[in-house]
Amino acid sequence: MAEVPEDYDSGPDEDGEPESERPELHKSYENAERDTMAEADSKLPAEIYHEPQPETEEEDFREGEPKSAKNVQLKPGGTALEGIAKESKRDVPSETEPGIPQEVKSEREMGEFFKDLEAPMDETHESDLEPPEEAKLNVTEDVFLESAMETDPVPPTETMSEVSGATVRERNLELLEEGTELGVPEESLRVQHEETGVEPPEQTQLDFPSEKPGESLEETDLQPPKMTKPDIPEETQRESTEKKRTEPPEQARPEFPEKEPRKSSEEAGLEPPEETQPEVPGEMQRKATEEKGTELPERTKPDLPDHKSRKSTDENVPEPLEEIKLEFPEEESRKPNEETILEQSEMMKPESPEEIRKSNEEKNPQPPEETGLVLPQEINPRVEEKTQTKPTEEKNLELPDETKPRETHVEFPKEDRPEPIKSKYSVGKNELEFREPKKGKWSLSDEFKKEYYALGSIRESEESIGTHYEFSQPLQKSFDVSEVCSYLDPSESLTELNEFVHEKEVVDLSQDLKELVSEDDETQSKQGTELQFEHLNWDPEKVAEWISQLGFPQYKGCFITNFISGRKLIHVNCSNLPQMGITNFEDMKAISRHTRELLEIEEPLFKRSISLPHRDIIGLYLEQKGHTGIKSDALTLSEFVKAAGLQDYAPEITAPEENEELPCTEP
C-alpha cells in the first residue's frame, strides 16, 4: 500500500479555513438534514421507508469510520485526510444520488479539494484497497444497485423500491399490449419528475470531471464515463462486494440496466445539460452552506414518491396484474377501458403505502445494513401477501360490470355484452315489437335483436344464429345486408334496410340484364353468322332436298352423284352446271340465281373493271371455305377478313354497284 505524504495536512489552510471547521460544517449539514427530513416526512406519508434516515446516517458514519480507517491504512499524520475524505465522500453521494448537480458546492471548497487532494489521491488510487476484479464488478452494470444501496444517506430500503420499480417496469413492458397498468405509472412518474425538477444522471456526470476531480478520483478512474454515480466510498464498495456475494448478480443485472436508461430517457427531456453547466459557475456556486443543508433533503425527498409509486405498483402488480391479464384479454382489447385502468391504478397506489407503513414500522429498529439485507427477503413477501388479498377483493367490488373476471362473462355472455352497445340506441322494445308485424321477415324474438345489435362482427352474429336459432338461407343473407345499417337507429335502419335491399336487388337485376344483353348480342352475332353460313354444313342430301324445294327435283341425283355439299355451292353457276349434267339454260339460270341468294353473293356485271376481284368478300370467303382441310374448316369470316386485309371492305356494303367498284387487294 502506498502511503499518503505528510504534507497533505497543510493543504486546506490555503483559503484561511482551518480543518477544525470542517467537522462543524458537517454537523450543521446533518442538523439541517434532520430538520428538513422531519418536515418532509410529515408532508409525505407514503415515504415511511425513509423515517429512520437520521439514525441511519449516524450509524453509517459510525460504522463507516472504522471501516474507512481500516481500509485506507493511513499514517497518524493522515487523520485529517480521513475526516476530509469521509466528509467529501459522504456529502457527494447524498447530493448526487437523486440527480442533483454540483451547483450547491461553493468555489472555495472546490479549489481546496482539487489542489490538496490531487497528488495524494492519485497515489491512493494506485494503491487501491480493492482488487481490480472486484472494483470492475462494482463499477459495471451493478454499480447502479450498490451505489443506490450504500452511498445514499437515505436508508437502503430505497434500493428495494428501486429494484421493485425496475421489476414493475419489466412486467409492464410485457403487459403493454393489454393496456392494464403501464400507461398510468409512466405519466405519473413524468409529472413527478417535472414537478421536482430532477435532472438526469447524465447531467451530474457532466459536472463531475470539471468541479470535483479530487473527490472522486478513485472511483472515476475505475468507472466508465456514462456511470451516473461516480463517488462510491471505500466502505460502501467493500459492503457492496459483500452483499454482491450474498445476492446473485443475476438479480441486479436484468433489473437496473432497464430502469436506468428509462429514467435517463424520461428525465433527459426536462433539463438539457447545456442549461445546467452555465448555472454551476455563475449563481448556484455562490449559495451558502445553509442553503445546501435545506435544499439537500428537499431535493432528495421528491424522488421518494417515484420509488414509492413504483414500490406500490410492484406490490400490487405481481399477481393482480397476471389475474387481470388472464381475466380480460379480449374484453380489454375490444372496449376502451382507459377509465377502468385509471381506477385500478388509483386503487393500488393509496392502499399500498399504508401496508408499507405497517411493515416498515416493524422493521425500523433494525440497523441499515441488516434492513438492506432483510427487506428484499422478508418484508416483500408479507406486503405482497397483504396487497394481493386486499386489492383483488376491493377491485372485484369496485370494478364495473364490464371488467369483471372472465368467469362471469362465460356464465352470462348475452347479458353483459348488449348493455354497453345497447346504450347507443334510443329505441325500446315496444318500438321494435311494433315494427315486427309489418315486415314478415323481420319477426324475430327480442333476445335475438339484443344480441344482434350487440354483436360487433358478422362472424359472431353468424355463430349466434347458427347455435341458438335456425333461419333459412335468404334470411341470413338479408341479415348480412343489414350489417350496413347496424350503426344507424333501429327505427331508421328497418326502413332504410328495405330500401337498400330493394336498391341492391335493382342493381343486381340491372347488372344481370346488362350481362344478359351482352350475352344475347354475342349469341345473336354468333347465331347470325351461323344462320348466314348455315348452308356450309349441308351434306349432298340436304343440298338435293333444297334443289327439289326450288322446283327442280329431277336434278337431285346430279348434286348427289357429284357430291355437291354446302361448301361447294359457291361453284354452282352457269359455267359449271352443264358439267354436272344440267343442260337446260333456263334451269341453269334459276339454280344459279337461287344459289347466289342463298349465299348472299352477287355476280359481277360485265361492265366492271378487270382489276376488281372476281367475287366480293363473302364470295371470296366462300371460295376459301370451299376447300377441304383443317384450316378451311376452322376459318371464319372475321379471320378471313383480317388475314386478307379486307377490313375496309366489310360485308356491310351490300349494294351490287358498290360491291363491283371495290378495289382488288388480292390477285
Swiss-Prot record:
Gene3D superfamilies cross-referenced by the UniProt entry: Transcription Factor, Ets-1
Protein name from the UniProt record: Sterile alpha motif domain-containing protein 15
Annotated stretches, region: Disordered: 1-108, 147-424
Domain (SAM) ranges: 538-601
PROSITE patterns linked: SAM_DOMAIN
UniProt source species: Macaca fascicularis (Crab-eating macaque)
Name of the coding gene: SAMD15
Matching CDD domains: SAM_Samd14
Spans traversing the lipid bilayer: none
InterPro entries registered for this protein in UniProt: SAM (IPR001660), SAM/pointed_sf (IPR013761)
Biased composition, class Basic and acidic residues, residue ranges: 19-53, 84-93, 187-196, 228-266, 284-314, 322-338, 346-364, 381-422
Pfam families attached to this UniProt entry: SAM_1 (PF00536)
Biased composition (Acidic residues): 1-18, 268-277
